[in-house]
UniProtKB/Swiss-Prot annotation:
Source organism of the structure: Mus musculus (Mouse)
Chain intervals for the UniProt region annotation (SUMO1-binding): 462-473
Sequence ranges of the Sequence repeats: 520-523, 557-560, 598-601, 612-615
Region (4 X 4 AA repeats of N-T-S-L): 520-615
Tissues expressing the protein: Expressed in kidney, heart, spleen, brain and cerebellum; weak expression, if any, in liver and lung.
Subunit (UniProt): Interacts with NR2C1; the interaction promotes its sumoylation. Interacts with DDX21, CSRP2, AXIN1, JUN, SATB2, PLAG1, TP53 and STAT1 (dimer), following IFNA1-stimulation. Interacts with SP3 (preferentially when SUMO-modified). Interacts with KLF8; the interaction results in SUMO ligation and repression of KLF8 transcriptional activity and of its cell cycle progression into G(1) phase. Interacts with CHUK/IKKA; this interaction induces PIAS1 phosphorylation. Interacts with PTK2/FAK1; the interaction promotes its sumoylation. Interacts with SUMO1, UBE2I, NCOA2 and AR.
Substrates-to-products reaction catalysed: S-ubiquitinyl-[E2 ubiquitin-conjugating enzyme]-L-cysteine + [acceptor protein]-L-lysine = [E2 ubiquitin-conjugating enzyme]-L-cysteine + N(6)-ubiquitinyl-[acceptor protein]-L-lysine
Protein name as it appears in the record: E3 SUMO-protein ligase PIAS1
Gene behind this protein: Pias1
Main subcellular location of this protein, as a coarse class: nucleus
Length: 651
């Protein structure tokens, strides 16, 4: 009962943030005002909470009200330099006290050397809620060799109950350490660099495994009252998310006093997080280059090729329960990082794939930005787990003209060549294979011709370069319409051929024959003057010009038209259609009238007007062209000039 009352009193003294942590830990709703959160926490306690929740309440209460191990009266120092030191701060006890009030494993400088500022800060020391030197180990950095520990991993702790906290540390250098740092100075560049460095690192206070570098939130570091530059903030991935710094070791060598008599102080300020504690450590390290790491990797030796062959056989072993079996594996000899041929093929022991990457490029990239992630499977591939594959070293030695290989079930390998390379190799043997294939083709063709002449057998030569199939074939010759072929006679389809009489479909009344005795034959001969004109262009021969003409009936001089049609030679085949171009003044359209054969113009009449129309018989045109006006009969002349008074458009 007393225990529950004590827990209730602890819950009543918690703040909003601590109540939210408690309710969230218990799986309850943690939203609301303080009195609502307090009511929920009391109901949780009244309902009988688990021992884990009770421990959480006590932990939150201890953080809320830390117990003091020293009081200001105990650590009052009226004048360190003039008055005797109190018994509690005797010289024998000072070396075991650090600035956060915890015993230290390494002796530190007396308090009088810290100055009056830190003497006034001594009363505000924290309690022993966290171990000063917990069993914390930080991950080993491949590019740094550890020379010494200046400050062992120590928890960041402060008696300040506020969110922003601050604590101070101090360390001193030995003469040997000062000499190591001074002798490693490199002033060749614009900056003064040191290969032996003083390195500050932060991590989480966890002992389960070696810890990675992890900065506390809102970290600020001052070394000897000078601000220390930290890595820049990373851009947030989402809106409203607080930006964070990339956690890396901090080089504070340029801010350290290289002296054996003057100590170095480090003031760390950060923002406290509920449920998380941090630790810091200071090391003396030596920086290494990628060349040194590559030499060390080679010194480890090359892995036996049989290990890789066993892995290949394991991957290609058929699973009896699976319907799909892998029969081969294709692996590239190009590095996935630089897309260049591998020189030192390596991969991590933790990787399950066979694909390797180049060790030189991998180490150089991590020297600029240490991530140590496998470029093939995106898993962690630390330097300590890298191995050089002996099987790939053999492949690179014997396969110099190929960038891809294929592993088989027995662990053997074969180069994978492109189609063009394979075709070039097979083309060199076409001298023998071509003769055999041509002989075989000839024998098959002769045998089929003797047995069945009507049946053709197509023999395909597989040794011919396939690139010829990809070439564009010449388009087949365009077929000429039989009705428009120059050698074929013009079709009479859709054309009405009439003798020397009036058309039965003509709407004009029959006219009596005109006496042509009074017409002088020399006059007609004048109209037979040949027109020497160039033929009509081919691209204009099939065009229909009637839509561009007006729909009214157009009358032309029939005598001139008939004479022009009779004068055109028979070898001009420019009129490919049965339409009549109603132009008399243009030489282009007069050429269209030179169509040969027995075709006739279709009978037409005006659609809108009531004018009379008639047809021109091609027979009369043929007679007038083939023989002459002098040999014509009077009836022929009358049929041309008397019966057909005018010609109208089809449209």
């Amino acid at each position: 009962m007393a225990d529950s009352a004590e827990l209730k009193q602890m819950v009543m003294s918690l703040r909003v943030s601590e109540l939210q942590v408690l309710l969230g830990y218990a799986g309850r709703n943690k939203h609301g005002r303080k009195h609502e959160l307090l009511t929920k926490a009391l109901h949780l306690l009244k309902a009988g909470c688990s021992p884990a929740v009770q421990m959480k309440i006590k932990e939150l209460y201890r953080r809320r009200f830390p117990q003091k191990i020293m009081t200001p009266a105990d650590l009052s120092i009226p004048n360190v330099h003039s008055s005797p030191m109190p018994p509690t701060l005797s010289p024998s006890t000072i070396p075991q006290l650090t600035y956060d009030g915890h015993p230290a494993s390494s002796p530190l400088l007396p308090v009088s050397l810290l100055g009056p500022k830190h003497e006034l800060e001594l009363p505000h020391l924290t309690s022993a809620l966290h171990p000063v030197h917990p069993d914390i180990k930080l991950q080993k950095l491949p590019f740094y060799d550890l020379l010494d520990e200046l400050i062992k991993p120590t928890s960041l702790a402060s008696d300040n109950s506020q969110r922003f906290r601050e604590t101070c540390f101090a360390f001193a250098l030995t003469p040997q350490q000062v000499q190591q740092i001074s002798s490693s100075m490199d002033i060749s560049g614009t900056k003064c660099d040191f290969t032996v460095q003083v390195q500050l690192r932060f991590c989480l206070s966890e002992t389960s495994c070696p810890q990675e570098d992890h900065f506390p939130p809102n970290l600020c570091v001052k070394v000897n009252t000078k601000p220390c530059s930290l890595p820049g903030y990373l851009p947030p991935t989402k809106n409203g998310v607080e930006p964070k710094r990339p956690s890396r070791p901090i080089n504070i060598t340029s801010l350290v006093r290289l002296s054996t008599t003057v100590p170095n102080t480090i003031v760390v300020s950060w923002t406290a997080e509920i449920g998380r504690t941090y630790s810091m450590a200071v090391y003396l390290v030596k920086q290494l280059s990628s060349t040194v790491l590559l030499q060390r990797l080679r010194a480890k030796g090359i892995r036996n090729p049989d290990h890789s062959r066993a892995l290949i056989k394991e991957k290609l072993t058929a699973d009896p329960d699976s319907e799909i079996a892998t029969t081969s594996l294709r692996v590239s000899l190009l590095c996935p990082l630089g897309k260049m041929r591998l020189t030192i093929p390596c991969r991590a022991l933790t990787c399950s794939h066979l694909q390797c990457f180049d060790a030189t490029l991998y180490i150089q990239m991590n020297e600029k930005k240490p991530t140590w992630v496998c470029p093939v499977c995106d898993k962690k591939a630390p330097y300590e787990h890298l191995i050089i594959d002996g099987l790939f070293m053999e492949i690179l030695k014997y396969c110099t003209d190929c960038d891809e290989i294929q592993f088989k079930e027995d662990g053997s390998w074969a180069p994978m060549r492109s189609k063009k390379e394979v075709q070039e190799v097979t083309a060199s043997y076409n001298g023998v294979d071509g003769c055999l294939s041509s002989t075989l083709e000839h024998q098959v063709a002769s045998h089929n011709q003797s047995s069945n002449k009507n049946k053709k057998v197509e023999v395909i030569d597989l040794t011919i370069d396939s690139s010829s199939d990809e070439e564009e074939e010449e388009p087949p010759a365009k077929r000429t319409c039989p009705s428009l072929s120059p050698t074929s006679p013009l079709s009479n389809k859709g054309i009405l051929s009439l003798p020397h009489q009036a058309s039965p479909v003509s709407r004009t009344p029959s006219l009596p024959a005109v006496d042509t005795s009074y017409i002088n034959t020399s006059l007609i001969q004048d109209y037979r003057h040949p027109f020497h004109m160039t033929p009509m262009p081919y691209d204009l021969q099939g065009l229909d010009f009637f839509p561009f003409l007006s729909g009214d009936n157009q009358h032309y001089n029939t005598s001139l038209l008939a004479a022009a049609a009779a004068a055109v030679s028979d070898d001009q085949d420019l009129l490919h259609s049965s339409r009549f171009f109603p132009y008399t003044s243009s030489q282009m359209f007069l050429d269209q009238l030179s169509a040969g054969g027995s075709t006739s113009l279709p009978a037409t009449n005006g659609s809108s007007s009531g004018s009379n129309s008639s047809l021109v018989s091609s027979n009369s045109l043929r007679e007038s062209h083939g023989h002459g006006v002098a040999s014509r009969s009077s009836a022929d002349t009358a049929s041309i000039f008397g019966i057909i008074p005018d010609i109208i458009s089809l449209d």
